[in-house]
Amino acid sequence: VTKLVLGVMGKLRSRPALGPSAQSIALPPPEKHGGLPLLDALAQRRSGRDFKPDVLPLPMLSTLLWAAWGINRPEEGHRTAPSAIDCQEIDLYVALPTGAYLYDAKAHALHLAAAQDVRRVTGYQDFVDQAPLDLVFVADHARMTPVPAGERERYAAVAAGAIAQNVYLFAPSAGLSTVIRAWIDRAALSEALALSHDQQVLLSQTVGFASR
């Protein structure tokens, strides 16, 4: 039975975590200097769908998450990607083999959201099951009260797109491959991450070392 059929049947589920699920993971300080020049990173930006299962080293994961949606102006709490009226409405979930975690930008740490291997629920493509990291972009509409209700999904989608592009630009500097995906069983993923009714799954993004 394919993952798509399981999704249609409402039976696409997480798998047991591949190892102990730590309640929190303190990330080392991110590398904020160096990397490819911007124009070189743009020239190398591409989507890849063939991944090795090798886990990303923690320092690399730390810098990736900071580049994606970290705090780059601590005195103001502003981030590496824009958000309308500075709502900072995007929650970035990190699906690892050992569990799913919420990225806490202020503490620069990961907090356990689900002690399960949620990767297979982040998309219908087979490669999401084996890649070491799947990012899930979730909009929290409760933080968007200054934005008109009819505009919130659109504004959040723009913010998620900016974060995803940060990941795309970081990837070639770190020798990584990535692809963003919208073909998702959002109901199953919301259940797996125990999201509230105010939280909306927007996109997923797979990251890892290219297998070819």
Role assignments for model-derived ranges:
Residues D129-L133, D198-Q200:
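Short coil/turn connectors at secondary-structure junctions
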Residues L193-R212:
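A glycine-rich helix N-cap at a beta->alpha junction
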